[in-house]
A protein has these predicted regions:
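Interdomain hinge/lid region at the active-site interface
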Residues: 192-221, 228
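General small-molecule cofactor/ligand-binding pocket signal
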Residues: 30, 195-197, 241
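Short amphipathic alpha-helix segments
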Residues: 18, 179-191
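Electropositive phosphate-/nucleotide-binding environments in soluble metabolic enzymes
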Residues: 11, 59, 117-121, 174-178, ...
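N-terminal Rossmann-like NAD(P) cofactor-binding subdomain of oxidoreductases
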Residues: 1-172, 189
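Short Gly/Pro-enriched turn/cap motifs at secondary-structure boundaries
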Residues: 172-176, 199-202, 251-256
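C-terminal active-site/capping subdomain that shapes the small-molecule cofactor and substrate pocket
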Residues: 212-261
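Active-site-proximal catalytic alpha-helix in oxidoreductases
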Residues: 146-164, 175-182, 201-213
Length: 261
């Protein structure tokens, strides 16, 4: 039985992760007494007992427990932004290539990609790798997300407040300093940060990311699809759709509750 501990299981990310892992018959979820949720020593003991520990914590709290667990051999997967661009941490996007997959398999420390970053990198990385778009180009990313991505506070606002402003999509990150921008640039291999437009909309879950770029080489749509299909191969969590599969409308909540792209 594979033992897993989730530090921060009471938060939105921790709860959804626990729901998924609870479906697995080969995984035992280690629990901690609610009175000890903020007790560093008690958490360290649970981390040490686990084969894998997930940290579903704010950045500062993740840094604190990682420092405390620096000598612990348990594989730690952090879901905050704290370590996504840090040396010594594997970036948890194995679909980007063999080097990433190998690092995820072998590293004791893994940084889980951000939600907006996942879709953005998934689109841009194959294009940059193929030389279809330049690394120093200026690209625009629009990412529409449901309100659950904002955690318990935002969920409560949307579900309990009666504010007319919440009835329409809202653009944020207007200063172009969104916390996902550094990892998007790093792992898409961009030398110029893209213009990033994140939008939260009045639906619970789901995301739709679009990337704008000039197809200066004039590749037909079929060739672009083949480029993505060849890059991702038979990855189980990424499907490259054919023209026959494309709907007339693409809903941003089509994959809500799923783990695939």
């Amino acid at each position: 039985m594979f033992k897993v501990f989730i530090d921060g299981q009471e938060g939105t990310t921790g709860l959804r992760l626990a729901e998924r892992l609870a479906r697995r018959s080969d995984i035992k979820l280690l629990s901690i007494d609610s009175a000890l949720r903020k007790n560093t020593q008690a958490r360290l003991e649970k981390i040490s007992q686990a084969d894998v520990a997930f940290l579903c914590l704010p950045d500062a709290a993740s840094k604190e427990i990682v420092e405390a667990a620096k000598d612990c051999p348990t594989k730690i997967i952090d879901t905050s932004t704290a370590f996504r661009c840090s040396d010594g941490w594997a970036y948890g996007f194995p679909e980007l290539g063999h080097a990433y997959a190998s690092a995820v398999a072998n590293s004791p420390r893994i940084a889980n990609p951000g939600c907006h970053a996942t879709g953005s990198i998934a689109v841009l990385a194959p294009l940059v790798a193929a030389g279809l778009i330049p690394a120093d180009g200026l690209y625009t990313l629009t990412s529409l997300t449901g309100y659950s991505g904002g955690g318990k506070k935002m969920i409560a606002e949307y579900e309990n407040l009666h504010d007319p402003e919440l009835d329409a999509p809202r653009l944020y990150g207007l200063n172009q300093k969104h916390k996902h921008l550094p990892e998007i640039a790093k792992y898409a291999k961009l030398t110029t940060a893209p213009i990033f437009l994140p939008i939260v909309a009045p639906y619970y879950s789901g995301m739709l990311v679009t990337a704008g770029f000039a197809n200066t080489q004039g590749l037909p749509l079929a060739a672009l699809r083949k480029l993505f299909a060849d890059f991702y191969g038979k990855q189980p969590f990424i499907q490259v759709q054919t023209s026959e599969e494309l709907p007339k409308m693409l809903g941003s909540n089509n994959l809500a509750g799923k783990d695939s792209l």
